[in-house]
A protein has these predicted regions:
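Compact, glycine-rich, soluble single-domain proteins
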Residues: 1-71
Length: 71
């Protein structure tokens, strides 16, 4: 499942990132990488997530390429 499929308030662990080096670097700069725990704040329009008390907004296309497991 992807981050884009989660509902507001749900927690997930990042399992994989589907994309090339540039895409992975862009996410890494935002604190998103394999093994990271994230919480969805909002899933309306851009997907807004919380990572270690930081808020990050992702476009739906980006969010669909981040594979997660709900926890």
């Amino acid at each position: 499942m992807s981050i884009a499929e989660l509902k507001a308030g749900e927690w997930a662990k990042v399992l994989a990132i589907e994309g090339g080096y540039g895409f992975r670097q862009k996410l890494l700069l935002r604190g998103i990488f394999e093994g990271r725990l994230v919480r969805v704040i909002s899933n309306r329009g851009p997907v807004t997530i919380e990572i270690d008390r930081n808020i990050v907004s992702l476009g739906r296309g980006m969010a669909k390429r981040i594979r997660v497991r709900r926890i």
